Regions:
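Conserved sequence signature across two-component system core domains
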Residues: 8-9, 34, 52
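Two-component/phosphorelay signaling modules centered on CheY-like receiver
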Residues: 12-32
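Helix N-cap/capping motif at the beta->alpha junctions
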Residues: 33-42, 63
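Short amphipathic alpha-helix used as the core "switch/output" element in two-component signaling
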Residues: 42, 64-75
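Active-site residues of response regulator receiver
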Residues: 55
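Receiver (REC) domain active-site loop signature in two-component systems and cognate sites
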Residues: 58
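Alpha4 helix (beta4-alpha4-beta5 surface) of REC/receiver domains from two-component response regulators
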Residues: 65, 86-102, 113
Length: 127
């Protein structure tokens, strides 16, 4: 079943890298992009997003705060924090929020593993 994936990153280059990998891995799924947390929250609240990939370092609301806000309304949505900042504290906070963590630079294998797990999780929720 095709899903809609939201990529939230203030860096156009980072969004392009993720989009390129995404199209190689899941060409049948839909990818939508957001440049900041406020825009992402609007998109998520519309209910049209199944999965989210969220950058940690963004102006205003950071990625972990965005995950926390999404969790309040959509506790089962598969979410991953995508960041070059691989400090244990950040990875730990992501896990506390029941979010995955994908290090940058992004690899196809890491993205594929997360998306496969997300698809299984959504399938379980639907049944």
């Amino acid at each position: 079943m095709p899903h809609k994936v939201l990529v939230v990153d203030d860096s156009k280059l980072a969004r392009m890298v993720i989009a390129s990998a995404f199209r190689r891995i899941r060409p049948e799924w839909t990818l939508v992009e957001s440049v900041n947390a406020d825009e992402a929250l609007t998109m998520v609240s519309g209910g049209a997003v199944d999965i989210a990939l969220i950058d940690f370092n963004m102006p205003g609301i950071d990625g972990l705060e965005l995950v926390a806000r999404i969790r309040k309304t959509y506790p089962a949505m598969p979410v991953a924090v995508v960041s070059a900042n691989i400090q244990d504290e950040i990875i730990g906070r992501a896990r506390e929020l029941n979010a995955g963590f994908i290090p940058k630079p992004l690899t196809d294998d890491a993205l594929a593993a997360f998306l496969s797990g997300a698809a299984l999780r959504l399938k379980k929720v639907a049944t």
